[in-house]
């Protein structure tokens, strides 16, 4: 039986793990819903998610006075035109149609909130949208939009520069795992932390430029989204390397470094190895290959039988072999379409990569990081004897000061008002200054 066209893919947790689901066949629209000429009552940008169990799917809907668009960032769907929008008092219906197949949203408008039911192919899930204020919609990123050339196409980024004329050093900031944007926010998690945006702005204030970018398939780089089975870890490395090459050609920059956060640390190591990078900084980077990281995480979640099966699958993947038959309970992690990416990812060992770097290296971690424990940083530092190690008290995985309890720690992941953890920026600046990676008029020099 031929599988219907796939529209929605869900990325889970930290492993760019996607699960496909099929389009809903055309449904009859309630005849009582009357189409109106103006949708001014709901005009504007609305953000929220489809509440799929354990895997909320972020969506963005923009209504105009006559129609609208929908974006599903995880899928790479950007401002796709709505087929119809119908409003009757507080009852709202809108849909999209692709290849003559339909997805529907039906709900109620309650001032600044829309809630209702999303339906496709006989499956229904709740959805909720919140209206963005005019101030939020109008808010623009500071900095200069830039593009780097790839083997196929271009990748977009944001250049943040100091106020002085330069030349100044520039740091390529690489985001962590999953569907993460240039500011450090994961679209699969409601709310923002803006940690990488804060880092870029703080560096600019101290005379250090930076380039940060949405990962391929996310935000400004949705155009780079491809089929899941075609994704390879090397593509992320090539993206980072392209930014190094871009910066090397720009006369505004005196030196070029890389700052990699979480998975971005591994990507950054590999990119630094293949380019003429002057310095490398790891923020909350793992100290072991992803298969070992996965086993530790799965040990806390799976039954003994499922854990054994997971280990067997990982053994095969490490040998470059795909596993076609996967238990339904493990499908979201090990489905066949994601296995080529995992095979390519497992190939990279941060312990081996960090030893091969011939440039100054700073390894940073927080002692309240519940995703990547400080012993990872210590392991990297041990292998790279001439590296510098910085363990920051009370700092967690999103680079914020966090309480000791898990719930309070996780709450910082969605609070953009919290500043970066004290000691992070100064620690980075001291390291850069020590290795002469500073602006001409840097006050620390």
Regions found by a protein language model. Give the residues of each.
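Primarily recognizes the serine-hydrolase "nucleophile elbow" in alpha/beta-hydrolase
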Residues: 245-299
């Amino acid at each position: 039986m031929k599988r219907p066209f796939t529209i929605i893919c869900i990325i889970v947790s930290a492993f760019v793990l996607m699960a496909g689901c099929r389009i809903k066949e055309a449904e009859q629209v309630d005849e009582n819903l009357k189409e109106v000429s103006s949708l001014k009552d709901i005009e504007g940008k609305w953000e929220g998610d489809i509440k799929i169990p354990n895997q909320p799917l972020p969506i963005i809907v923009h209504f105009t006075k006559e129609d609208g668009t929908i974006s599903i960032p995880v899928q790479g769907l950007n401002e796709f035109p709505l087929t119809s929008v119908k409003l009757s008092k507080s009852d709202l219906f809108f849909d999209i149609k692709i290849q003559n197949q339909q997805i529907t949203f039906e709900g109620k408008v309650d001032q600044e909130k829309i809630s209702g039911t999303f339906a496709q192919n006989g499956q229904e899930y709740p959805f909720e949208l919140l209206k963005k204020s005019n101030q939020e919609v109008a808010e623009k990123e500071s900095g200069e939009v830039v593009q780097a050339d790839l083997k196929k196409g271009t990748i977009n980024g944001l250049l943040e520069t100091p106020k002085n004329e330069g030349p100044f050093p520039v740091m390529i900031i690489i985001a962590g795992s999953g569907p993460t944007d240039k500011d450090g926010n994961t679209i699969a998690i409601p709310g923002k932390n803006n940690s990488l945006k804060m880092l870029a702005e703080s560096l600019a204030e101290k005379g250090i430029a930076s380039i940060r970018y949405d990962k391929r398939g996310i935000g400004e780089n949705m155009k780079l989204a491809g089929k899941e089975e075609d994704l390879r870890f090397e593509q992320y490395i090539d993206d980072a390397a392209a930014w190094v090459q871009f910066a090397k050609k720009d006369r505004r920059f005196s030196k070029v470094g890389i700052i990699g956060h979480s998975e971005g640390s591994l990507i950054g190591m590999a990119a630094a190895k293949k380019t003429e990078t002057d310095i490398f900084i790891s923020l909350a980077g793992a100290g072991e290959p992803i298969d070992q990281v996965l086993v530790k995480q799965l040990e806390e979640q799976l039954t003994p039988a499922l854990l054994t099966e997971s280990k067997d699958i990982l053994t095969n993947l490490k040998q470059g072999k795909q596993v076609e038959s996967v238990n339904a309970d493990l499908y979201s992690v090990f489905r066949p379409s994601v296995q080529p990416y995992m095979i390519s990812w497992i190939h990279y060992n941060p312990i081996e990569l960090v030893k091969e770097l011939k440039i100054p290296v700073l390894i940073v971690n927080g002692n309240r990081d519940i995703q990547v424990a400080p012993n990872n940083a210590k392991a990297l530092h041990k292998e790279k004897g001439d590296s510098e190690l910085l363990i920051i008290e009370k700092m967690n995985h999103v680079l914020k000061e966090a309480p000791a309890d898990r719930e309070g720690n996780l709450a910082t992941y969605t609070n953009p008002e919290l500043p970066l953890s004290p000691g992070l920026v100064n620690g980075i600046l001291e390291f850069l200054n020590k290795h002469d990676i500073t602006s001409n008029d840097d006050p620390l020099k």
